[in-house]
Amino acid sequence: MARDYQVRKYIADNAAKYDDSRLTKVLVKAFDLICSNEEPNGCMSSSVALHVILRSLGYEPKLCYGLCVTPLGNEIYHAWLELNGEALDIAIYGNSHFSPFWNDAQLLPVVFENYNNTAIRYRDHVFDEDWKNCMISQAVNMGSIANYIAKAPHAQHPSGNGIWKLIFSILDETYTRSKQESLQRFVSKEAFQCQEQ
């Protein structure tokens, strides 16, 4: 898929408030990977990967998840990040552009936006009776980010752990065991948690 330079610019412009080229680079790279893979269901894996990366850059993101409401009123279980009280959701672009099940408006990534200004109504820790059946619930039931990285279905891929591969792809770095161990300290024993909106 061709790169969407307007969306890349939008991400870079919104990330500029942090005046951190490393942050801008990883957000644009995460977007590029979602587009090149035409990833429709990557909200948890993308959010976890960016959570690890942002912590390694010195930020304190929160990993959020819950039942969100789309512009046309459809409900979806979704995962995203929050940084300094603002939503960060690169994966919503993939959900809205590549999923055959998406029956709503195509959305831009949400990059450091106030919750009141987003097209999606994010509802952290809001669940319905079908929560236990959704893929995000299965990830949360693994207990911690470290367990999710180690035990998620894509973690057992023959060519290596999928989440670590995603992290290194977003960082645009070659995988090394020592670098993984360095990054691992940002996720070990960190439980899935979020504050209610």
Q: What role is predicted for each listed range?
A:
Residues 1-197:
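A structural boundary/capping signal
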